[in-house]
Amino acid sequence: MGMKFFNPVTPSSRGTVLVSKVGLSKDEPEKSLTSGKKSSGGRNNHGRITTRHRGGGHKKKYRVIDFKRNRSGQGIVEKIEYDPNRSGFLALISYKEDDIKSYILAPQGMKPGDVVTAGNDADILPGNCLLLKHIPVGSFVHNVELKPGNGAAIARAAGCYAQIVGRDGQYVLLRLRSGQIRLILSSCKATIGVVSNPDHKNRKLGKAGRSRWLGIRPTVRGIAMNPVDHPHGGGEGKTSGGRHPVTPWGVATKGKKTRRRNKSSDKYIKQLKG
C-alpha cells in the first residue's frame, strides 16, 4: 500500500507518517461476519489492571476471521479491508458453491479477483492453505497452527512470516521472525505468503491523540513517580533513579530473561531467538 507523508500544515501533522489506505475497500464490513466487542480497558474479571496503558479508544466491531481454513473449494477475493482489531488487512472471500463468505488474513500482494483454495492439492500460491508436509522447504508461510485443528497461532501480525527450513520425521523445522527455530507437527496447517501491510512498523502517529484513538494510554516514567508508586520514584530534584532499571514491581528489566524454566514446549525449540 505504501506510506502517506503529511505536510506540516499543523503542529500535529508535522512528522506524521501513516500507512496509505489506497486500494482498500470503503464499504461497511460484511454484517454476517461482524459482532460487538466490549473493550476490557486492560482489566481482568476482577476489575484489576493486568495490562497497563490500555483504555478508551474508538468503538470497534469485531470481524470473525477463519483461522482454521477447513472449507474446501475455490474462493474468490471480493475485496481487501481494513481491520481496526489487528495490524494486517483482511480479505473477504466468497465461495460460490454454497454461497458462503468468510474473512481471512490478506497476504501481501493479494487483490480483488484472486482465487484462493485450501487442501492438500492446492498450488503453492499466496493465500492458499495446506498442511506443512505438503509445502516445499524454503517457502514463506503465515497463519501457522501450533496444534492440528486448533487454528492459526503463529505469524499473524502485519508483515510477519515464518520460513520452512527443514524436516525432522513427523515434524517441520520453522524459523520465526525472532530467529527462533521451532519444531511444528507436519500435520498442522499454514498459509502461503507474508501477511499484508509490512509498512505498519514504519508509521509515525504524530500526536498523542492518535494513540488515544487506538486505545493506548500514556506511559509514565518511573523516575517521574513518587516512591510509593515505583522503585525509581522520589529523590530531591532530578535523579538517575539510583539503581539498575526495574519494573514497577522491582523485577530487573533491560535484558533479563523472562521465559519460565522447564516449560513443556522447550523440547520443540531447536534454536533460541537471535
From Swiss-Prot:
Residues 263-274 have a biased composition (Basic and acidic residues). Residues 21-59, 224-274 are annotated as: Disordered. One of its GO terms (cellular component) is large ribosomal subunit. Residues 32-42 have a biased composition (Low complexity). SUPFAM superfamilies: Nucleic acid-binding proteins, Translation proteins SH3-like domain. One of its GO terms (biological process) is translation. Residues 45-59 have a biased composition (Basic residues). InterPro entries: NA-bd_OB-fold, Rib_uL2_dom2, Ribosomal_uL2, Ribosomal_uL2_bac/org-type, Ribosomal_uL2_C, Ribosomal_uL2_CS, Ribosomal_uL2_dom3, Ribosomal_uL2_RNA-bd_dom. Keywords: Ribonucleoprotein, Ribosomal protein, RNA-binding, rRNA-binding. Signal peptide: none annotated. The keyword Ribonucleoprotein applies. Coiled coil: none annotated. It comes from the Bacteria. GO terms for molecular function: rRNA binding; structural constituent of ribosome; transferase activity. The keyword Ribosomal protein applies. One of the primary rRNA binding proteins. Required for association of the 30S and 50S subunits to form the 70S ribosome, for tRNA binding and peptide bond formation. It has been suggested to have peptidyltransferase activity; this is somewhat controversial. Makes several contacts with the 16S rRNA in the 70S ribosome. Part of the 50S ribosomal subunit. Forms a bridge to the 30S subunit in the 70S ribosome. Belongs to the universal ribosomal protein uL2 family. This is Large ribosomal subunit protein uL2. It comes from Wolbachia pipientis wMel.
